[in-house]
Amino acid sequence: MQFHSSSALITPFKKDLSVDEAAYESLIKRQIFQGMDACVPVGTTGESATLTHKEHMRCIEIAIETCKNTKTLSNSRMKVLAGVGSNATSESLSLAKFAQKIGADAILCVSPYYNRPTQQGLFEHYKTIAQSVEIPVMLYDVPSRTGVSIEISTALKLFREVPNIKAIKEASGSLKRVTELHYHEKDFKIFSGEDSLNHSIMFSGGCGVISVTGNLMPNLISQMVNCALKLEYQQALEIQNKLFHLHQALFVETNPIPIKMAMHLAGLIENPSYRLPLVAPSKETIQLLEKTLQQYEVIA
């Protein structure tokens, strides 16, 4: 996986709640022009759970087409880490095969939510999906969402026994997990899935981030990651601290509710629309977002 900085993309909707494809393409191009290495369509932040199978595939397709046709500032191509998560292994497998067929660089697969599988069930789930494709696979551990954690022993077993399982997105909130995973397998790539811990994870064995805040501030997320990769601890910490209040504000309600409203307030999407059961943020949250964006001089 030849990338380090990436954003978990929001999925913009029109007022009728259909996917706003033009806005989606524009957001991806902004990621490219502001220095991100990769984009992650249709993950948690992309509201994948409320997209139809057809919409899910179309979002992956748009991301791949846009990255293929738009060069980065270094005249290269931004990578696409396609979200293929589902609580049905068969659906994830289908999405994984589709993503590979149309040119995704790698896939991100979340643990099945609601089902609460055993560790053996998780192992078989990930193994089955990974063995159906040849491109790299990133595990995604986010127990607050799924109700089940990929135990360290299970993650290590998957890495050791399934050749194309190369990485894990760590959104457990546990630095202890990160340090333990890195201690046991230095080549197992760890990506931060928790913006408030980006700096800490990068200096505890992590090699990159998948950021929500990066939707709004891709340049600063990219700069922080690049500083960390060069072992410029203090410079990376200064950027992390600079983003502290924004990271906090974007998670006062369930993700992606605040980030979509923030993107709207910043003029980056026309409609801050959500599909039920997600709803618009409270007045208090909107006021907090407005105040925070003013502090960062995103809005006047």
Swiss-Prot record:
Primary site of residence: cytoplasm
Pfam families: DHDPS
Keyword set, alphabetical order: Amino-acid biosynthesis, Cytoplasm, Diaminopimelate biosynthesis, Lyase, Lysine biosynthesis, Schiff base
Xref: PANTHER family: 4-HYDROXY-2-OXOGLUTARATE ALDOLASE, MITOCHONDRIAL, DIHYDRODIPICOLINATE SYNTHASE
Oligomer and partners: Homotetramer; dimer of dimers.
Protein name: 4-hydroxy-tetrahydrodipicolinate synthase
Residues reported to bind pyruvate: 45, 210
UniProt keyword annotation of Endoplasmic reticulum present: no
Record Gene3D superfamilies: Aldolase class I (3.20.20.70)
Active-site residues, as the UniProt record annotates them: 140, 169
Keyword Iron-sulfur: no
Subcellular location: Cytoplasm
Leader sequence residues: none
EC number(s) reported in the record: 4.3.3.7
Cited function: Catalyzes the condensation of (S)-aspartate-beta-semialdehyde [(S)-ASA] and pyruvate to 4-hydroxy-tetrahydrodipicolinate (HTPA).
InterPro entries: Aldolase_TIM (IPR013785), DapA (IPR005263), DapA-like (IPR002220), Schiff_base-form_aldolases_AS (IPR020625)
Protein species of origin: Helicobacter pylori (strain G27)
GO biological process: diaminopimelate biosynthetic process; lysine biosynthetic process via diaminopimelate
GO cellular component: cytosol
Catalytic activity reported: L-aspartate 4-semialdehyde + pyruvate = (2S,4S)-4-hydroxy-2,3,4,5-tetrahydrodipicolinate + H2O + H(+)
Pathway: Amino-acid biosynthesis; L-lysine biosynthesis via DAP pathway; (S)-tetrahydrodipicolinate from L-aspartate: step 3/4
Site feature: Part of a proton relay during catalysis: 44, 114
GO terms of molecular function: 4-hydroxy-tetrahydrodipicolinate synthase activity
Superkingdom classification of source: Bacteria
Enzyme class: lyase
Family affiliation: Belongs to the DapA family.
